[in-house]
Structures are given as structure tokens and as C-alpha cells.
Amino acid sequence: SALLPEKGSTVLYLGAGHGTSISHLYDHLCGQNNQHGGRIVAVDLASRCLRDLTHLAKTRPGLVPVLGDARKHSAWGVLVPRRVDWLFQDVAQSGQVDIFISACKRFLNLDGIGLLSLKAASERWTGEGEEALFASVEDKLRDSGFEIEESIELTGYEDNHVLFVTRRIE
């Protein structure tokens, strides 16, 4: 499934937060004590989040916590020496789609899977409502060399959020 990366691969996770989702992803990708040899580069802007991620990494070899701004990958990109096949972004900043496209162009392999968790409330949108925002994001992704495999409304879990499952084709 495109929603999960291949076991033992290297993934980039932008907007790692306190590590709840990272912990579940780690179990799949790395296995107990990293028996699969996977690696998660987990980037977050908040020092409090990094503290929690660093604590989590002590018991999870292969988890690399990074204090950094997802928009400024020149500052932390050296920690991702090769392109990845799977990238997940869950940042609460305006310009989410631009951050995602830039990161994917820099770090995601062609034919790689990129997941964008888009929060409508984080955008400075002056258009005709959330549906128009989500449609404009789809258009921008397609125009930037991504195929949209699926868009999943997260209503009931996270209101006003859509998860875009994309494949980089250019």
C-alpha cells in the first residue's frame, strides 16, 4: 500500500511533532530494535517536540530527530544523504503545498510516494471556502509533477484536513 513505506527503507517525516505517529511508523518501518534496518529522519520546528523525539530515539535506533524548519531544508538536508522513496508532511504553517513540493523535488525519488496532510486552518486562503482550497492544492500538485493517487478527507479524526497521497512523476 502507498500509505506505508517499505520495511527497511529511509523516510523523511516533516512536522514530526511529539512522535506519536512516528512511533507507530517506526514499528512498521524498522521493527523491534531496528531489525529491518530502516531510518526515519523526523524534522520539527519546536524544541519541545525535539525533546520528546530525542527521548523516543534513545530506545528506537534508526530514528533521527532534527530541529529544523521544513521550509529551510538547506540547514538540515545533509541528514538525508540520498533520496527517499516515501515522504510525509504534517506541518501547521501556511504555504503547506509549496513546502511539500519543494521538499519532494529535493528529497523524493521519481515514482516515490509523498503524503501531504493539509490543514485548511493553517492556510491564508482568501478563496471560496475549503473545497476550493483543496481543489487548488490538487491542481498545484498536478502542475508540479505529481499524480494524485488518493485524497482522503479526515473528517471525524481531524476536521478541515485532507490527506493527499501522491506519486512524484516528474
Q: Language-model features: where?
A:
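Glycine-rich helix-loop-beta junction characteristic of Rossmann-like nucleotide cofactor-binding loops
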Residues: 1-6, 80-81
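Conserved class I S-adenosyl-L-methionine
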Residues: 6-19
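Glycine-centered, small-residue-biased loops immediately flanking beta-strands
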Residues: 9, 38, 112
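Conserved SAM-binding loop of SAM-dependent methyltransferases across substrates and taxa
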Residues: 18-35
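A short acidic, amphipathic alpha-helical/loop segment
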Residues: 24-28, 99-104
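Conserved SAM-binding motif I beta-strand of class I
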Residues: 36-44
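S-adenosyl-L-methionine
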Residues: 43-96
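C-terminal substrate-binding/active-site "lid" region of AdoMet-derived donor-dependent transferases
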Residues: 51-55, 101-169
